[in-house]
Design a protein with these regions (language model features):
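Short beta-strand/turn micro-motifs at beta-sheet edges
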Residues: 5-8, 75-81
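Short loop segments at secondary-structure junctions
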Residues: 60-63, 75, 95, 131
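Vicinal oxygen chelate
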Residues: 2-3, 13-14, 23-27, 48, ...
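Core segments of cupin and vicinal oxygen chelate
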Residues: 22-65, 119
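The feature marks the first
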Residues: 6, 14-21, 39-40
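Short, structured motif recognition centered on aromatic/hydrophobic residues
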Residues: 16, 39, 56, 66-69, ...
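Short, basic, helix/turn surface patches
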Residues: 67-73, 141-151
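A conserved beta-strand-loop-helix scaffold within acyl/acetyltransferase catalytic domains
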Residues: 73-74, 118
Length: 160
């Protein structure tokens, strides 16, 4: 077969579609993600790969990809350990420093323990845990990745 002279179409990822967490009790997850964080419970179904596991989808009002976090219920599983192959945290975007401060005050009023606002150079954030111990982050968009290097040089500076 003759090789094509055309360059193959460039493959581009469009961002995250969703993140799935393993939880012990979906009722606690509904209480937290819907009633505390304000996400819409978009879908209640079962895991396509294990129909014994309930699968809940939370997201924005339209359930758009990129806004969703899903929970698979496995009440019989033990708590996991942090290590290679595990995920450290999931970050949600908030619009501004003022919104981040508002979220922090609101979470504390709901007895959700969270960190002080942390300056991460490229954004500011607050960390908290969901009822199953997953680390969640609320993060601002700015000041952005170009705060210490120009756009055209992003990712070229050596680390360490």
């Amino acid at each position: 077969m003759e090789a094509s002279a055309q360059q193959p179409r460039r493959l581009v990822l469009g961002g995250l579609h969703h993140v799935t967490l393993i939880v012990k009790d979906v009722r606690r997850s509904v209480d937290f993600y819907r009633n505390v964080l304000g996400l819409r419970l978009v879908k209640q179904t079962v895991n396509e790969d294990d129909r014994s596991a309930r699968h809940l989808f939370f997201g924005d009002e339209e359930g758009r990809p990129g806004t969703m976090i899903t929970c698979l219920e496995y009440p019989q599983l033990d708590e996991g350990t942090v290590g290679v192959g595990s995920t450290h945290h999931v970050a949600f975007s908030v619009g501004s420093d003022e919104e981040l401060e508002g979220w922090r005050a609101y979470l504390e009023s709901r007895d959700v323990q969270c960190t002080e606002v942390l300056d991460r150079t490229y954004f500011r954030s607050v960390y908290l845990r969901d009822p199953d111990g997953h680390i969640l982050e609320l993060a601002t968009a700015g000041p952005g990745m170009t705060v210490d290097e120009p756009l055209e040089q992003l990712g070229q500076r050596a680390v360490g």
